[in-house]
């Protein structure tokens, strides 16, 4: 009987560590999701700024001088 009790205790210990690991991983996933959301917001701000640039500041494809190898 002692062997069965030891096995049960070992399984309970492993389960406790797995629960802790799952919780730690969950917290990391939450942090990463927040980071991704922040980065998406920053990208949207950059897109808005790029779209707001006046076209006169940028040369069109026809106005660009061709590279020297042409």
Swiss-Prot record:
Domain of life assignment: Bacteria
Pfam families referenced in this protein's UniProt entry, alphabetically: SlyX
Similarity comment: family membership: Belongs to the SlyX family.
Protein name as catalogued: Protein SlyX homolog
Organism: Shewanella oneidensis (strain ATCC 700550 / JCM 31522 / CIP 106686 / LMG 19005 / NCIMB 14063 / MR-1)
């Amino acid at each position: 009987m002692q062997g069965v009790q030891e096995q049960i205790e070992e399984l309970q210990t492993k389960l406790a560590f797995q629960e802790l690991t799952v919780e730690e991983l969950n917290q990391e996933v939450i942090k990463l999701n927040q980071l991704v959301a922040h980065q998406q917001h920053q990208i949207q701000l950059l897109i808005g700024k790029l779209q707001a640039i006046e076209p006169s500041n940028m040369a069109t494809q026809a106005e660009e001088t061709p590279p020297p190898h042409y």
